[in-house]
From Swiss-Prot:
This is Peroxidase 13. Residues 1-22 form the signal peptide. GO terms for biological process: hydrogen peroxide catabolic process; response to oxidative stress. There are 73 peroxidase genes in A.thaliana. Heme b binds at H189. The lineage of its organism: Eukaryota, Viridiplantae, Streptophyta, Embryophyta, Tracheophyta. Ca(2+) 1 binds at D65, V68, G70, D72, S74. Transmembrane segments: none annotated. GO terms for cellular component: extracellular region. It catalyses: 2 a phenolic donor + H2O2 = 2 a phenolic radical donor + 2 H2O. It comes from the Eukaryota. The gene is PER13. Glycans are attached at N280. Its main location: secreted. Its EC number is 1.11.1.7.
Length: 319
């Protein structure tokens, strides 16, 4: 596990993020619930031990939460119908709700009504990354839980079929840079799997961004007319380990989903990806450090603080 120096993260956080984000604090629960972060960490560690795939699941959960209504735990709400945010087409396959619910249940035993579900999502993503041998970083906390979860609000999520210009636009709308796009999209895919449902559309014809040999591998794993729910690794060589191999795969035409592959067709994105390609420790450390910054930046999107929102008693329902 790579540990990122706290003072560097603090410096970046205060220099780069906006006013509302700066209201988040490192150690927000140090007095009201001192064991909050360790409780979440214990639950995540057990979940990833039982199923290593949970690491990527929890990382993806924070991404999808933050891109709709901001990082407010709105994706967790389940009213009972199909109009909730979690049922949006762009959230297909999003999971990890059970881990968040378990962490919340434990926190309510020790510190009832104190720790927000939005913060649990952010902490769980951090701990999941660390469990996958990725960087451990301090997470600013103090988010409050949102009150709105509407499927219509999730229509503009980044999609695996998006063009490079569309991806850039969607990230910029959230205050995220091209580098953040590379890190939070392709970089985050260093761990985890995807369903054949998202791959098969690329295989109708020979996609020029796919290595011909890899094209045949993908077609054998995700044949036309086959089970679209079959899952395959996003990082073909190390799906459970946080490393920079995903960038080499993309360069070599072994990107599994289109939204990863198209990044290398853009000159600016290509330069960013190439900067993380070296096998030396410095390059790997730079990727880990930059990924940490991008996660903290994303984790501050649209946060609710102070008297905004609420602290839910159950993560799946508003109070």
């Amino acid at each position: 596990m790579i540990t990122i120096a706290l003072f560097l993260v603090l410096l970046y956080f205060h220099d780069q993020l906006g006013y509302s984000a700066a209201q988040l604090q490192f150690g927000f629960y140090s007095e009201t619930c001192p064991s909050a972060e360790s409780i979440v960490r214990d639950v995540v560690q057990q979940a990833v031990t039982n199923d290593p795939g949970k690491a990527a699941v929890l990382l993806r959960l924070q991404f999808h939460d933050c891109f709709v209504e901001g990082c407010d735990g709105s994706i967790l709400i389940k009213h009972g119908g199909n109009d909730d945010e979690r049922f949006a087409a762009g959230n297909a396959g999003v999971a990890g709700f059970d881990v968040i619910d378990e962490a919340k249940s434990e926190l309510e035993r020790f510190c009832p009504g104190v720790v927000s579900c939005a913060d649990i999502v952010a902490l769980a993503a951090r701990d999941a990354i660390a469990e996958a041998k990725g960087p451990f970083y301090e997470v600013p906390t103090g988010r409050r839980d949102g009150l709105i979860a509407n499927v219509d609000h999730a229509k503009n999520l980044p999609d695996v079929q998006d063009s490079i210009n569309t991806l850039k636009s969607k990230f910029r709308e959230k205050g995220l840079s091209d580098q953040d796009l590379v890190l939070l999209s392709a970089g985050a895919h260093t761990i985890g799997t995807t369903a054949c449902f998202f791959v098969i559309p690329r295989l109708d014809a020979q996609d020029p961004t796919i290595n011909p040999e890899f094209f045949q591998i993908l077609r054998s794993k995700c044949p036309q007319g086959g089970d679209v729910n079959v899952r395959i690794p996003l990082d073909w060589d190390s799906q459970f380990v946080f490393d920079n191999q995903i960038f080499q795969n993309i360069k070599n035409g072994r990107g599994v989903i289109l939204s990863d592959s198209v990044l290398y067709q853009d000159n600016n994105m290509k330069k960013i990806i190439d900067s993380y390609l070296e096998t030396n420790q410095s390059s790997k450390a730079n990727f880990a450090a930059d990924f940490t910054k991008a996660m903290i930046k994303m984790g501050a999107i649209g946060v609710k603080i102070g008297a905004e929102g609420e602290i839910r008693r159950l993560c799946s329902a508003t109070n």
